[in-house]
Amino acid sequence: MPCRIAIDGPAGSGKTTVAKLLADALGIFYLDTGAMYRIVGLYLSENNVESDEEIERKLKELKITFSNGNFFLNGRKIGNEIRTPEIGIYASKYAKRLPVRNYLTKIQREIAKNQSIVVEGRDIGTVVLPDAEVKIFLVASQEARAKRRYKELMEKGVEVTFEEVLSEIVLRDKQDSERDVAPLKKAKDAILIDTTNLSIEEVIERILKVVKEKCKL
């Protein structure tokens, strides 16, 4: 029986790192849904799209594919250009739009269908995979999350200040929690883990215990 693991939480809570390492530890597939929203944010911002009608038309021209650990946008390989604070804000802006969420939710459900997988995002346990076998909700203080994101961006060679990263975190928290469509919130049956003072290894260890209890992998 497939074991689908949903990992949700706000920007910078450690979702991506935890999800990748967890998938590696379990030997199963990993899906970064946040990257998909960033790709759509990049594409729609490049095309100056605003109305729902324009968004729906542009989404019909959009093809997101995933191969060998890389995302492709209409055949164009996507790299660190989607990891900037600016694109993060665009991603959160367009994530509020129903056509975008419907478009990506359909793709995400199709990818996760009938296989063991770690899916990471903001509405996985509540909207995308409400029947996931394991649901985890990660949280951390805004300053801790900003420090992590800043370090990550510096290592990737992205030029940004800590203040810019912290401002993005604060803004995205507000946008993600207040949007009408699929707002960021903990699923009732999700396990809450505060990662502020935990190492990545400690977080992984806690999640693996839950997976062992609920899945046969």
From Swiss-Prot:
Family according to the record: Belongs to the cytidylate kinase family. Type 1 subfamily.
Q: What is its main location?
A: cytoplasm
Organism expressing this protein natively? Thermosipho melanesiensis (strain DSM 12029 / CIP 104789 / BI429)
Q: Where in the cell is it found?
A: Cytoplasm
The signal peptide annotation in the UniProt record is none
Q: Which positions bind ATP?
A: G9, P10, A11, G12, S13, G14, K15, T16, T17
Q: What is the protein name for this chain?
A: Cytidylate kinase
Instruction: Provide the gene name from the record.
Output: cmk
GO CC annotations on file: cytoplasm
Q: Which domain of life is it from?
A: Bacteria
- Name any Gene Ontology BP term: pyrimidine nucleotide metabolic process
